């Protein structure tokens, strides 16, 4: 969350930022709650001082009538303080709810836009494949090659689930190993993370775990949720910790990701593109404030490097204000070319990386020492490999006229094969 003092000192900036993000929030309500809370704290302090004076007066050698008066006065002060403290508790709770709704300030170079259509293309890389046949989409390819089964998954688990089969199993594991090997060489600590997190961690990272807007699954009768990304569990790893940050602390975590994907439908969401469960290798970094922009750009470069080595055409987007998540100061998306997407092929999102500055660390109480003072760390996240969408891009870009699929050279040492042959 933003520092409350910063909000009060920069009301017009915060108000404009809320507007640019397409949100309707009652900033004045937040300020009114804070104003009343401050007055109550002052009033309670004054009443406690009077109560102490009253208690000290009772220690003197006084008559019965005076003592009775002081006793009654003490009771009245206690009752008034209790009433005000109850009001203070209510206000503090309401203040926190409104405070959490305020999004991070956007970076100066974030484009202002009302929808994802106003994301700005920064770069296009790779050659879009030219086929001398009509390319199939991944769903048709995968069923023909016996790589996945949606029908059986629908019977067993419901819509938007799938079984990976045969070579697709090796291909997913190969993508994960490829990403982990690269990140290990870049100095990341590697993790396989829990797939479950407590509500205060989910909330601290900035995911809304409750209500109709929630995109993650709650485990019934607990305070736990299935994670939508390892960003949640990696970000929570150092909850309530003061770090010794001599250099940026980089982590990479593999997790299953669970998403409700409520309302997602249409041809662009079919097959593996938008599902309830998938595997993902996530990058994460805790760093000093002066390092976060540099690390964010390094994460983008790493994501690009991965897709260059996978030989997949892609483009980089500077995500516009209304498409930013609340914690993000700035976000880049990479979209891979998918020949089977739409009528003539199109780009589809495969990675994102966000600099969340100290927005998450304030909630999670993750700090570092500098010049004898505790400061909130900056937190950066990014996708290394999201298995399902990367699999889509591989199947669709490397299909051939015979109905088979070539494996990218960078994955062959992990798969043990370089081609998926058509089934007879």
UniProtKB/Swiss-Prot annotation:
Cellular location(s): Cytoplasm
Enzyme Commission identifier(s): 6.1.1.11
Broad class of where this protein is predominantly found: cytoplasm
Catalyzed reactions: tRNA(Ser) + L-serine + ATP = L-seryl-tRNA(Ser) + AMP + diphosphate + H(+); tRNA(Sec) + L-serine + ATP = L-seryl-tRNA(Sec) + AMP + diphosphate + H(+)
GO cellular component: cytoplasm
GO terms, molecular function: ATP binding; serine-tRNA ligase activity
PANTHER family (UniProt xref): SERYL-TRNA SYNTHETASE (PTHR11778)
Function of the molecule: Catalyzes the attachment of serine to tRNA(Ser). Is also able to aminoacylate tRNA(Sec) with serine, to form the misacylated tRNA L-seryl-tRNA(Sec), which will be further converted into selenocysteinyl-tRNA(Sec).
Official protein name in the record: Serine--tRNA ligase
Organism: Borrelia recurrentis (strain A1)
Name of the gene this protein is made from: serS
């Amino acid at each position: 969350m933003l520092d409350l003092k910063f909000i009060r000192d920069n009301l017009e900036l915060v108000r404009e930022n809320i507007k640019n993000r397409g949100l309707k929030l009652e900033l004045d309500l937040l300020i009114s709650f804070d104003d009343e809370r401050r007055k109550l704290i002052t009033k309670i302090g004054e009443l406690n001082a009077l109560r102490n004076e009253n208690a000290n007066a009772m220690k003197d050698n006084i008559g019965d009538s005076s003592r009775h008066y002081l006793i009654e006065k003490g009771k009245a002060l206690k009752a008034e303080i209790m009433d005000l403290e109850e009001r203070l508790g209510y206000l503090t709770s309401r203040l926190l709810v409104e405070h959490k709704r305020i999004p991070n300030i956007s970076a100066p170079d974030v484009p202002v836009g009302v929808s994802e259509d106003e994301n700005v293309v920064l770069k296009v890389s790779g050659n879009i494949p030219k086929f001398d046949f009509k390319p199939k989409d991944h769903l048709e390819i995968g069923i023909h090659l016996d790589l996945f089964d949606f029908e059986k998954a629908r019977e067993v688990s419901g819509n938007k689930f799938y079984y990976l089969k045969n070579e697709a199993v090796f291909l997913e594991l190969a993508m994960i190993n490829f990403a982990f090997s690269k990140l290990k060489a870049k100095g990341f600590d590697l993790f396989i993370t829990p797939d479950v997190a407590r509500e205060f961690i989910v909330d601290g990272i900035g995911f809304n775990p409750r209500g109709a807007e929630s995109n993650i699954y709650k485990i019934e009768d607990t305070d736990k949720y299935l994670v939508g990304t390892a960003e949640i569990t990696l970000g929570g790893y150092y909850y309530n910790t003061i770090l010794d940050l001599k250099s940026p602390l980089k982590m990479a975590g593999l997790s299953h990701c669970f998403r409700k994907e409520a309302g997602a439908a249409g041809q662009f969401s079919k097959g593996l593109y938008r599902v309830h469960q998938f595997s993902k290798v996530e990058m994460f970094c805790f760093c000093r404030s002066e390092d976060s922009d540099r690390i964010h750009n390094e994460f983008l470069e790493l994501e690009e490097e991965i897709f260059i080595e996978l030989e997949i055409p892609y483009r980089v987007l500077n995500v516009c204000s209304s498409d930013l998540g609340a914690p993000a100061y700035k976000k880049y998306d990479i979209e891979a070319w998918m020949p089977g997407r739409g009528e003539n092929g199109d780009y589809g999102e495969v990675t994102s990386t966000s600099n969340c500055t100290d927005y998450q660390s304030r909630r999670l109480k993750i700090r570092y020492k500098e010049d004898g003072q505790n400061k909130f760390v900056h937190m950066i996240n990014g996708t290394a490999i999201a298995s399902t969408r990367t699999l889509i891009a591989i199947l669709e870009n490397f299909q051939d006229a015979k109905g088979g699929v070539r494996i990218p050279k960078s994955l062959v040492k992990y798969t043990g094969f370089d081609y998926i042959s058509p089934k007879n």
